[in-house]
């Protein structure tokens, strides 16, 4: 099984280009099932989860063509959904990726039936699918869970309705939003997720002919249409990848510019980096961070739904606090079991105490390289970041988690001066 070896001690300097957002491209690929003509998606990142989604679309009968593109143009995927013949998403594909549940709404709305295996993905606590089910039931769907599958049917077109999410759910909002696009009448979604990836999905749907207002706010209104046509959409840049590279620069005392970024989606993260002592300069599509060779200051943070601090950046900032001046307190309010990276950071010499959903991190002047194991996607990123500042070699096992969410991370870090390599 592949591993990554990081040799610490190098400050990062230079420029890096940000890839398309993992959490935007997956629902957008699923949304192509709603159309009755080919849809082209560009700025698609090279990620394992994208490959899994393409396999799933192909399994359903869609014709999928991948254009690898160039460094400047990027990768694009053309999906022709007119050949879809199956409405069952099998366990073999769904078990590796939670986002597979996002075919439920589109299949149900377009074909009146869908069977989707209960999802897998990162093992970071119970991420219930009840918000998806309740939301679709509010549109008139008949849903049962049998033998590990969610089975949904509708009698004719779904009917517009009002649904108030019990809790903010990004994928729940996306699934119900996609279904509502082809429902008869008006749908109002309250307490909807406001994440930029939800807005990007809505922008894609609008480009295909949907009528949506309020995406990016807690109240989304959808006027159902009879059909969606073909079209093109470019996926927005990945704010979590952007944040990860900025934290890497901050931890190593370096100076890095990230390009093809969207700093307007990163306010909470940029505020914390400024608090840590970084000088931040932004343009519409770039962020420059300069630590002037200094050690970062510890920061306190609490994860919460957008526009607050993202849970997907929590592990990276914990790594930063491990080598910062002072004590940082991190409160995780989104997912349970999302401190699984703590034990691995302790192996590198970190000083962390966990009390329930709170981690107290006392900064150490140095970390020491050691063999560690990735437990989920963002935890694997935090271990690489810690390895960048640890003495000696840090060997990270189970990096298949990393390939689910970061495109060529070792090449990108290497271009900034990191000593990092992948081994078999």
From Swiss-Prot:
Catalysed reactions listed for this entry: phosphoenolpyruvate + UDP-N-acetyl-alpha-D-glucosamine = UDP-N-acetyl-3-O-(1-carboxyvinyl)-alpha-D-glucosamine + phosphate
One term of GO molecular function: UDP-N-acetylglucosamine 1-carboxyvinyltransferase activity
UniProt protein name: UDP-N-acetylglucosamine 1-carboxyvinyltransferase
GO cellular component annotations of the record: cytoplasm
Function summary: Cell wall formation. Adds enolpyruvyl to UDP-N-acetylglucosamine.
Binding site for phosphoenolpyruvate: 22-23
Family: Belongs to the EPSP synthase family. MurA subfamily.
EC annotation from Swiss-Prot or TrEMBL: 2.5.1.7
Active site: 122 (proton donor)
Disulfide bridge map: none
Keyword terms, alphabetized: Cell cycle, Cell division, Cell shape, Cell wall biogenesis/degradation, Cytoplasm, Peptidoglycan synthesis, Pyruvate, Transferase
Binding site for UDP-N-acetyl-alpha-D-glucosamine: 98, 127-131, 312, 334
GO process annotations (BP): cell division; cell wall organization; peptidoglycan biosynthetic process; regulation of cell shape; UDP-N-acetylgalactosamine biosynthetic process
Keyword check for Metal-binding: no
InterPro entries: Enolpyruvate_Tfrase_dom (IPR001986), Enolpyruvate_Tfrase_sf (IPR036968), MurA_subfamily (IPR050068), RNA3'P_cycl/enolpyr_Trfase_a/b (IPR013792), UDP_GlcNAc_COvinyl_MurA (IPR005750)
UniProt keyword Plastid present: no
Pathway involvement of the protein, from the record: Cell wall biogenesis; peptidoglycan biosynthesis
Chain positions found as 2-(S-cysteinyl)pyruvic acid O-phosphothioketal: 122
Highest taxon of source: Bacteria
Location in the cell: Cytoplasm
Any Pfam family: EPSP_synthase
């Amino acid at each position: 099984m592949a591993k990554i070896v990081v040799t610490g001690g190098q400050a990062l300097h230079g420029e890096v280009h940000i890839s398309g957002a993992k959490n935007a491209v997956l629902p957008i690929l699923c949304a192509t099932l709603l159309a009755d003509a080919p849809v082209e998606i560009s700025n698609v990142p090279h990620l394992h989860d994208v490959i899994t989604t393409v396999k799933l679309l192909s399994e359903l009968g869609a014709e999928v063509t991948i254009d690898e593109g160039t460094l400047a143009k990027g990768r694009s995927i053309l999906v022709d959904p007119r050949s879809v013949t199956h409405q069952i998403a099998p366990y073999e594909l769904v078990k590796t990726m939670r986002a597979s549940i996002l075919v439920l709404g589109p299949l149900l709305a377009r074909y009146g039936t869908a069977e989707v295996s209960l999802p897998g993905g990162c093992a970071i606590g119970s991420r219930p699918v009840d918000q998806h089910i309740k939301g679709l039931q509010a549109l008139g769907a008949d849903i049962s869970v049998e033998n590990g599958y969610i089975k949904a049917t509708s009698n004719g077109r779904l009917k517009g309705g009002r649904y108030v999410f019990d809790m903010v759910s990004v994928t729940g909002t996306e699934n119900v939003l996609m279904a509502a696009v082809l429902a008869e009448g008006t749908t109002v979604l309250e307490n909807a997720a406001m994440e930029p990836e939800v807005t990007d999905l809505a922008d894609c749907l609008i480009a295909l002919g949907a009528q949506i207002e309020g995406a990016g706010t807690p109240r989304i209104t959808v006027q159902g249409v009879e059909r969606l046509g073909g079209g093109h959409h470019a996926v927005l840049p990945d704010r979590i990848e952007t944040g990860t590279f900025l934290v890497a620069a901050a931890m190593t005392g370096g100076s890095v510019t990230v390009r093809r970024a969207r700093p307007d989606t990163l306010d909470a993260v940029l505020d914390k980096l400024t608090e840590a002592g970084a000088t931040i300069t932004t343009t519409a599509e770039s962020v420059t961070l300069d630590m002037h060779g200094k050690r970062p200051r510890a920061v306190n943070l609490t994860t919460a739904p957008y526009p607050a601090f993202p849970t997907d950046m929590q592990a990276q900032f914990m790594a930063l606090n491990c080598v910062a001046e002072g004590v940082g307190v991190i409160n995780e309010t989104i997912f349970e079991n999302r401190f699984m990276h703590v034990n691995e950071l302790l192996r590198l010499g970190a000083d962390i105490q966990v009390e329930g959903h709170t981690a107290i991190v006392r900064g150490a002047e140095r970390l020491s390289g050691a063999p560690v194991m990735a437990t989920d996607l963002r935890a694997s990123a935090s271990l690489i970041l810690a390895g960048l500042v640890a003495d000696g070699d840090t060997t990270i096992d189970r990096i298949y988690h990393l390939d689910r969410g970061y495109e060529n991370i070792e090449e990108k870090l290497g271009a900034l001066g990191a000593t990092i390599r992948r081994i078999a």
